[in-house]
Amino acid sequence: MRAGVFDSGVGGLTVVKSLLEHGLFDEIIYFGDTARVPYGPKDKNTIIRYSLEAQEFFKNFDVDILITACNSVSAHAIEELRSNASFPVIGVIEPGVLALQNRGLDPKSQILVIGTQATIGSGKYQKLLREHGYNNILAKATPLFVPIVEEEIFEGPVLEATLQHYFDSLHPDAIILGCTHFPLIQDAIADYFNNEAVLIHSGEAIVEHLQKELGIKARKKTPSLKLFASENPEKLKKIAAHWLRDAFKTNEL
């Protein structure tokens, strides 16, 4: 079974890591639209256009499923992608909320949702959380985290100052990492909150969804991974080596 994974940049590698670790597919084709990252500040029509263009790329590979590992795309373009596809298209927002619910948190818990302007502004997370009984919601756009990750700043004073800028005086019970770039700095986020907040990671949420809702089971063979980028593929390959720890066979074409 072959899966396509699409993101605006390198952040979707966090979803790829979870998919590889659980062995849900025989092959994963990853495309990062690094020439046009970030999608977060773009308007809805632009995000839809970029997403449909990326979807055309995957038609060259006869994928069985497409995972939009970008919250901005999941917030604004998921229906357009589904109507234009002959295969299932899975977003990251609903799996993230369901993963939170599966943690068994008290409905009165404060839920902090962080993401790009496009994701937070769409209100999709807030709406779904309320539908699942969570009303103590703080949704906060944290766009600076995206270029920080793209610049491979995973620790140090720049990241620490940005964490302070966004999170000063906040004390959430759980945090939904509403951008697939953010798990690359999840250790720093967890440390900032003294490891007291439950973190919901899109990659693990997608795995839960694929297993429970679609019945996809682990394969016995080691999955293969092909990496593609619209610009600077060597940077994508470098970050993949860091994040995936060279644990899997990767080919960058």
From Swiss-Prot:
Its EC number is 5.1.1.3. GO terms for biological process: cell wall organization; peptidoglycan biosynthetic process; regulation of cell shape. It comes from the Bacteria. Gene3D superfamilies: 3.40.50.1860. PROSITE patterns: ASP_GLU_RACEMASE_2 (PS00924). InterPro entries: Asp/Glu/hydantoin_racemase, Asp/Glu_race, Asp/Glu_racemase_AS_2, Glu_race. Provides the (R)-glutamate required for cell wall biosynthesis. This is Glutamate racemase.
